[in-house]
Each structure stands twice: as C-alpha cells, then as structure tokens.
C-alpha cells in the first residue's frame, strides 16, 4: 500500500508484507487506514500517517482476522461502521493448500469459471459484514445473495449497496 503526495509528487510505502490489498477505507477523522488483505483473510488498521510498516509488525494491528471469506472492498459510513465485502467464500481447497504458494498463486489467477467453482459464494454464505470500528463488534451479516462475489460496497443513509460480480444490476439492503 502506497501513498501519493501531489504537492511534492512523491510516493511512499505505507504498508508492506500483505498478500493482496483488495480494499481501502479511511476513517472520518483521517487517522486510521483500513486495508483488506485478500491473501491473509484479514483487515489491518494502520495509522494513516505511518510509513514503511509491515503487516503484523510494530504499529500495525490486525483489526479483523479469521474472516469467513476473502475480503474485498471496504467502506465506512458516517457512524464508524466498516462494511467488508467478500470477494470469494472461504475455500476448503485454499485452506488445505495454504502452504503451497504456487498452487494458491495459480488458483488466484485462474479464469472466472475455475475461480467460481473453487471459491464461489453459496446462497447462505456471507457476502458482506458490518463491524463497529469503535469496539470491533459485529453489527450485521448480509447473506442469501447467490453471486460470484461482492466486488463493491457503498453505505448510503439507511441502505447499503452491493456490486455483485456477474450481475448487471446493483443490489441493496436496508440497515
């Protein structure tokens, strides 16, 4: 994860040591950057002013870990609720082959059909979850949406909108 400063046209690394930063969200006060880590199935909370951190190292804490799916897009609402969308469901095949980097790498680069067979979300799998950033409590799980994965999430007022892979329409849920 890198930060670009347009004033002096510089690029600096904020966070390294992650296996796929698939989503970013910045807290309303601008102090905390949340980073979804696709490879480790977790969300990191990072001091937004920090530089050159390593995931799991000093001053970089895991905000959520052991998630039921592979986190993708992140979004924060005005109440400090973090919405985590799941790009894929937790895969027993990937879990079993966690230490086989080559196999995992090939699977994550496979075509859409193969990925759907390995990681696709079932109708009862969570496609997104809502977490209170103040205390880390789980607020809500969004399930029952048979889709290839949730690629985007956007809270707006009393609704949350979901961009579903393979869907031509936008899905929503009341909160």
Give the predicted meaning of each segment:
Residues 68-140:
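Loop/turn-rich, solvent-exposed surfaces of beta-rich toroidal or solenoidal domains
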Residues 1, 13-32, 65-79, 117, ...:
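Beta-rich, blade/repeat-based domains predominating
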Residues 10-15, 59-64, 137-143:
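A short beta-strand motif characteristic of beta-propeller blades
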Residues 5-9, 47-51, 132-136, 174-175:
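Short loop/turn segments that connect beta-strands within beta-propeller blades
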Residues 83-85, 129-130, 138-143, 152-154, ...:
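Conserved active-site loop/cleft motifs that coordinate metal ions or position small ligands
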Residues 33-35, 42-46, 51, 65-66:
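Hydrophobic, well-ordered secondary-structure scaffolds
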Residues 1, 41-43, 90-92, 128, ...:
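Structural signal for beta-propeller blades
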């Amino acid at each position: 994860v890198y930060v670009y400063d347009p004033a002096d046209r510089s690029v600096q690394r904020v966070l390294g040591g992650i296996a796929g930063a698939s989503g970013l969200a910045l807290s309303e006060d601008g102090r905390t950057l949340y980073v979804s880590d696709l490879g480790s199935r977790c969300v990191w909370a990072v001091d937004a002013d920090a530089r050159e951190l390593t995931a799991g190292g000093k001053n970089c804490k895991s905000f959520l870990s052991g998630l039921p799916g592979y986190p993708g897009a992140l979004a924060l609402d005005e109440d400090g609720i973090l919405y985590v969308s799941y790009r894929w469901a937790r895969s027993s095949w990937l879990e079993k082959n966690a230490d086989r980097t080559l196999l995992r790498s090939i699977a994550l680069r496979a075509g859409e059909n193969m990925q759907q067979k390995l990681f696709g979300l079932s109708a009862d799998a969570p496609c997104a979850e809502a977490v209170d950033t103040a205390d880390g409590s789980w607020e809500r799980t969004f399930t029952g949406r048979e889709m290839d994965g949730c690629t985007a999430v956007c809270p707006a007022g009393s609704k949350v909108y979901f961009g579903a892979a393979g869907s031509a329409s936008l899905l929503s849920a009341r909160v």
